[in-house]
């Protein structure tokens, strides 16, 4: 376990890395005894720094929802991070590339809550009951921590990703919002185009067999900390495509079939 000073130092390093756009060394190398709980404590400390600086919590994200990603990360459950007010971009907007380090785009569904949601024992049915709208969403992920250590060639571990706010950096909401019982949320097909070329496609069932399962998992995971998911919060349910790298000048268009589409451009 890390001590309180190590936790604060790590959070400050992440904050400086985001501001300077210069990645820091992997925490899993600097702190070989780091645990999953340490990583979440670092994440909470970094989010607290941001909120102290004027940011507002707007919701949460769920990551590592596919079985393949969990196996590759040597874990058996998803991870989560915080969504802050300055992470949201309008659909169709120009997104400044200079704000990020190595941005990538993922395809998701977002749950907009209409009622409080709290574990333990939260189920998919509780999530559907508490959700006011489901809407297409793009998540922009980034890495403030080095993905590969230049000295050892070690790849980052799940401890690094969790500390790094589960890699979250931005959100674009768009397309057609629907009530959670209006469609089968498992069967939303998507096609992602980058500069007019199909790069990824997927279906929403790839998220834990039902995207609402991730939201239930999050409510249960946060229950020991007495955290309630609140009305109006945005919950990103997890990606059902592989991430696609974004470069300056890239235009993204994602077709969600009956739920419309989302477009954005990095400048």
Where are these regions (language model features)?
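N-terminal low-complexity, intrinsically disordered patches enriched in charged
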Residues: 52, 241, 247-248
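Catalytic-core "active-site belt" of small-molecule-metabolizing enzymes
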Residues: 2-209, 251, 259-267
């Amino acid at each position: 376990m890390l001590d309180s000073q190590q936790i604060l130092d790590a959070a400050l390093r992440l904050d400086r890395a985001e501001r300077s756009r210069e990645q820091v060394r992997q925490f899993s190398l600097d702190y070989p005894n780091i645990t999953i709980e340490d990583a979440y404590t670092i994440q909470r400390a970094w989010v607290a720094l941001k909120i102290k600086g004027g940011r507002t919590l707007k919701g949460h994200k769920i990551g590592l929802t596919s079985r393949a990603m969990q196996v590759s990360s040597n874990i058996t459950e998803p991870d989560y991070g915080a969504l802050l007010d300055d992470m949201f971009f309008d659909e169709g907007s120009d997104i400044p590339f200079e704000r990020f380090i190595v941005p990538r785009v993922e395809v998701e569904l977002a749950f907009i809550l209409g009622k409080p949601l709290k574990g333990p024992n939260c189920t998919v049915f509780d999530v559907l009951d508490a959700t006011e709208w489901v809407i297409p969403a793009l998540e922009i992920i980034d890495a403030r921590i080095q993905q590969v250590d230049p000295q050892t060639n070690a790849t980052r571990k799940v401890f690094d990703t969790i500390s790094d706010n589960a890699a979250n950096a931005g959100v674009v909401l768009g397309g057609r919002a629907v009530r959670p019982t209006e469609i089968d949320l498992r069967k939303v097909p998507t096609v992602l185009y980058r500069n007019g070329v199909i790069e990824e496609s997927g279906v929403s069932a790839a998220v834990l067999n039902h995207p609402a399962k991730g939201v239930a998992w999050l409510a249960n995971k946060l229950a020991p900390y007495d955290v309630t998911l609140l009305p109006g919060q945005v919950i990103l349910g997890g990606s059902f495509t592989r991430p696609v790298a974004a470069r300056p000048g890239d235009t993204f268009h994602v077709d969600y079939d009956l739920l419309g589409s989302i477009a954005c451009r990095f400048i």
